[in-house]
């Protein structure tokens, strides 16, 4: 098994972090996905903020018995700090809808759409959101040569944090026939767009601002670059002409609203160098809440400190009937 693959865990781990408070929050983190460690680190700051805000907090590292554990602890709200499979893909929201427990972040359909790169792409294009050319390749296709003219990007269908993403440049010693499909039997092959990496934080339908990511070491914004200090600079606000900056925010709000997202989200774009054309990459319905994370940074620029950001997210908690 690849170290980043989903792994099955039978029992949840439950820890009481604060036994008194105005409401009982179950902070859901960890879990069984490839992004487990990112989720756990994100939850550290969230738990401190929740306690500071006066909530009773129970931490749950989610396992397969999660429904039973939720029945036992009876939270008023679930703060969904999970990333990846089961938490970000609509699985947990579906369970919480059945149990009628209010939860933060997006619901079943929005989460599932955003998590699956094929279906989110169809949704984007249907709503006239510009994207790079791409094709879907199945393992059973047994493709021996490059499926697209280089440079191109290989993306697993349902991984976040750039896990499994590879950029194949013209000079790379890479044979597609040797690609082992480590994250499932399908991948998206996407045209590589050379340009500026732009990220927008959206909260409750309103774009808070945008930043630009300047790579310092690696060739693209991969897992290592995202979570290692010194691998990238964040320019906040993104140094763009006013009209282009405004367009970026409007496009992000459009994506958020057409997908019926809830709470926080992060929209990702590439601004092509030669044409100044915006290409949407994805929308992330479970953006990280770590010290290096983008949404808290943009929120701070917009005048919302981390604790207040968590409070605003809590206010959106609901279930779908």
Swiss-Prot record:
Binding site residues for Mg(2+) 2: 282, 284
Binding, ATP: 147-199
GO biological process: cell wall organization; peptidoglycan biosynthetic process; regulation of cell shape
Keywords, ordered alphabetically: ATP-binding, Cell shape, Cell wall biogenesis/degradation, Cytoplasm, Ligase, Magnesium, Manganese, Metal-binding, Nucleotide-binding, Peptidoglycan synthesis
Highest taxon of the lineage: Bacteria
GO CC entries: cytoplasm
Binding site for Mg(2+) 1: 268, 282
E.C. no: 6.3.2.4
Named cofactor requirement(s): Mg(2+); Mn(2+)
Cofactor binding: number and manner: Binds 2 magnesium or manganese ions per subunit.
NCBIfam families in the cross-refs: D_ala_D_alaTIGR (TIGR01205), PRK01372.1 (NF002378)
Listed name of the protein: D-alanine--D-alanine ligase
């Amino acid at each position: 098994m690849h170290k980043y693959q989903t792994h099955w865990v039978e029992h949840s781990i439950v820890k009481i972090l604060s036994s008194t408070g105005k409401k009982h929050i179950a902070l859901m983190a960890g879990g069984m996905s490839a992004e487990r460690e990112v989720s756990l680190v994100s939850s550290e700051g969230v738990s401190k903020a929740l306690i500071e805000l006066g909530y009773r907090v129970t931490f749950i590292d989610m396992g397969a018995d999660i429904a039973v554990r939720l029945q036992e602890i009876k939270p008023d709200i679930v703060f969904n700090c999970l990333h990846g499979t089961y938490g970000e893909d609509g699985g947990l929201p579906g369970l919480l809808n059945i149990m009628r427990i209010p939860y933060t972040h997006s619901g079943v359909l929005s989460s599932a759409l955003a998590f699956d790169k094929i279906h989110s792409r169809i949704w984007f294009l249907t709503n006239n959101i510009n994207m790079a050319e791409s094709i879907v390749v199945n393992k059973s296709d047994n493709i021996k040569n490059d499926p697209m003219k280089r440079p191109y990007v290989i993306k697993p269908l349902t991984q976040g944090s750039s896990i499994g993403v590879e950029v194949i440049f013209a000079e790379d010693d890479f044979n597609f026939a040797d690609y082992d499909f480590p994250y499932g039997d399908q991948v998206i092959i996407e045209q590589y767009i050379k340009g500026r990496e732009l990220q927008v934080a959206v909260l409750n339908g309103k774009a808070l601002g945008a930043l630009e990511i300047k790579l310092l070491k690696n060739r693209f914004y991969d897992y290592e670059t995202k979570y290692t200090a010194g691998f990238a600079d964040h320019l906040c606000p993104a140094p763009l002409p006013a009209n282009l900056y405004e367009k970026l925010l409007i496009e992000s709000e459009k994506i958020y609203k057409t997908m019926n997202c809830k709470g926080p989200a992060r929209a990702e774009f590439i601004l092509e160098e030669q044409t100044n054309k915006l290409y949407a990459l994805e929308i992330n319905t479970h953006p990280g809440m770590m010290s290096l994370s983008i949404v808290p940074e943009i929120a701070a620029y917009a005048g919302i400190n981390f604790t207040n950001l968590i409070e605003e997210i809590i206010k959106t908690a609901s279930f779908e009937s």
